[in-house]
Curated annotation (Swiss-Prot):
GO terms for cellular component: plasma membrane; proton-transporting ATP synthase complex
Protein name listed in UniProt: ATP synthase epsilon chain
HAMAP family, sorted: ATP_synth_epsil_bac (MF_00530)
Pfam families: ATP-synt_DE (PF00401), ATP-synt_DE_N (PF02823)
Its membrane topology: Peripheral membrane protein
Principal location class: membrane
Assembly notes: F-type ATPases have 2 components, CF(1) - the catalytic core - and CF(0) - the membrane proton channel. CF(1) has five subunits: alpha(3), beta(3), gamma(1), delta(1), epsilon(1). CF(0) has three main subunits: a, b and c.
One function term, GO molecular function aspect: proton-transporting ATP synthase activity, rotational mechanism
Cystine pairs: none
Function, as annotated: Produces ATP from ADP in the presence of a proton gradient across the membrane.
InterPro entries, sorted: ATP_synth_F1_dsu/esu (IPR001469), ATP_synth_F1_dsu/esu_N (IPR020546), ATP_synth_F1_esu_C (IPR020547), ATPsynth_dsu/esu_N (IPR036771)
Tagged with keyword Cell membrane: yes
Protein encoded by which gene: atpC
Entries under Gene3D superfamilies matching the protein: ATP synthase delta/epsilon subunit, C-terminal domain, F0F1 ATP synthase delta/epsilon subunit, N-terminal
Length: 138
């Protein structure tokens, strides 16, 4: 069976390193499904979940919360470089919930003061928190 090596790398080190037969990520142009022998690609990634169908007897699926970054696909090696990434099993849900509440509060405050930059920053924080919460439930 043809397979790919999947690595997710952050400034904190390698967060994921396994063999897979299918990967799904989200780019600014939409969802991208990746199978072995995919053409070479470099693309930006959105804050979203990453689905990885591993090469295993039980057809296991792993989920990773990706907070943006870049994907490179070359010679059946998929490398994702991201500011941060967390596997579903590693997500601290209570921390993510607190981050969600904090971002919602920051959005409301920034909108009342018409601080556009702060609204944008808080919306990014909210997307990241919601992404982590959603991935933790997979």
């Amino acid at each position: 069976m043809t397979q790919m090596t999947v690595q997710v790398v952050t400034p904190d080190g390698i967060k994921y390193d396994h063999h897979a037969k299918f990967i799904s990520v989200t780019t600014p142009d939409g969802e991208m499904g990746i199978l072995p022998n995919h053409i070479n690609v470099i693309a930006p990634l959105q804050v979203h979940e990453m689905k990885i169908r591993r090469v295993s007897e039980d057809d296991r699926v792993d989920w990773v919360a990706i907070n943006g970054g870049i994907i490179e696909i070359k010679d059946n090696v998929v490398t994702i470089v991201a500011d941060s990434a967390e596997r579903d099993r590693d997500i601290d849900v209570s921390r993510a919930e607190r981050a969600k509440l904090r971002a919602e509060r920051d959005i409301a405050e920034a909108e009342t003061t018409h601080d556009i930059d702060e609204v944008r920053r808080a919306k990014v924080a909210l997307r990241r928190a919601l992404n982590r919460i959603n991935v933790s439930k997979k």
